[in-house]
Amino acid sequence: MDIKRFVSAHPIWVIVILSLLTRLPFLFHGYGVEEDSYGLVLTVQRIAETGVYEMSRAPGHPVQELILSRIPNAPDFVMNGLSMLFGMLATIMFFMVMRELRYPKPLLAALLLMMMPVFYISSTYTIDYVWALAFLMCAWWLLLKHRYLLTGLALGLAVGCRVTSVLFVVPLVVYLFVNGSPRNAAKQLFLVGLPALLMTALLFLPALTVYGTGFFYTYPLPYPPLPKVFYKGTIGVMGVWGCVALAGALLTILFRGKKLQPAETDDSHRGVLLFAILMIAMHVLLYLRLPEKSAFLIPALPFLILLLHHYLVNEKSYAFWCALFLISPFFTSVQLVDKDRGSVASPLAVNQVVAGQEVSLDFIYGPVISDLTKRINKEHFVSKFIDSYQKVNEKSVILCGFWMNYIELKMKQEKIDNPQVVLAPGMSAEEIARYQADSYKIFYLREQETYNRIKYQYFPDDEAVLFIE
């Protein structure tokens, strides 16, 4: 078979095959590294058991919650596999967007998205980031095809995956008014907006019914140290080599200036670059407001790639920058050093303390391998916890913090219980005092004293005992 001819003739099959080859090995070993993934699985199991809607976390992610509640006891590789399929859909739709815009080498642009470390990893575990992006890419393509009602439906589904997808509305409005008269743009906006509003209202109706308007509430989190904010917004998104590639690409644009030969695209889609800039800017600002996770920047990635592709696709250096992006998931990473929840380092890793946290610069293992070893380490810790938990023979409270969802799901799956022990993510001063008055001993897992102070402004330093060293 002529591979070059096959790639040219069947680009979507190339995306499907590469998605399967690169994702399948990572669908096992639990539902991911995020506690939210395990909380989601527990939530959909309760929805299936009770028939009553429940949020996995505020403000609700009803598309994923309701779909997964139809397969609540599916093994990890099945639920993770759905994320793989939605990641595949997002990549295919981005390819179709780039092709619709008449950009050269649209498959290359799609592969850059596929191999972005944060996107790659998020398409291998049970979480909603790539689900939302898949529907956003569908909405974008449908918008370019002037299918306004379907654009609205796809946008509503994206918001039903992640409510922050509503940011897509701002560049959408600008795009419509740039490409048509105010009268036509207003009509098109109505055709998009009505189904989007109806779909969003329908999807969030269960949350509104059960929780009232309070379903939007979440407790405030402290702002992370600036080095961590920078890391999560750069290396955490693109990997080490991806950051090198982005810096090189931006410097090329800066120094080449007017000598650049931007791609020639379809003039019927004016305002696309402004569309991309707005999407990037809004998601960067949103991330800076609450820089908790690198994955919050996933919706900006297709638009960043579009801008790079637009200005650099005809530059000789672009092939080199693309090569760095494509290897970024597999080689070199900067990771947390922690025996229970950190990654396993290679022999060539170098450790350094940054902002009070020990981190490892690993010259061999890339982000996807490091993420896999984190998942395995967390599984080992939960197994170690359960072994110790089963041996407790006195009345005890264990504050589990961010480990709670991992532990609860594992115990539920293995039908493990100890009537002597109360497990909780955290407790207020009043709750702890009540248990102490009933002769309960207070234990906690490492680092969870910080969690309890953040959420409840209290931790019993003098009475609490570390459960596992």
Give the ranges of each region predicted by the language model.
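Short acidic/glycine- and proline-prone juxtamembrane loop motifs at membrane-interface regions
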Residues: 35, 121-129, 293-294
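Extracytoplasmic catalytic/substrate-binding loops of multi-pass membrane glycan-assembly enzymes
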Residues: 29-43, 54-67, 77, 378
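Transmembrane-helix motifs of polytopic, lipid-linked glycan transferases
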Residues: 13, 17, 77-101, 138, ...
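Membrane-interface transmembrane helices that cradle and orient dolichyl/undecaprenyl
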Residues: 99-100, 137-150, 312
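Membrane-embedded, lumen/periplasm-facing catalytic core of multi-pass transferases
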Residues: 40, 324-406, 410
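Loop-to-helix entry region of an early transmembrane alpha helix in multi-pass inner-membrane enzymes
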Residues: 58-62, 66, 73-92, 122
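Membrane-lumen/periplasm interface segments of specific transmembrane helices
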Residues: 187-252, 284, 288, 328-338
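Hydrophobic/aromatic-rich transmembrane helices and adjacent perimembrane loops
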Residues: 161, 167, 289-317
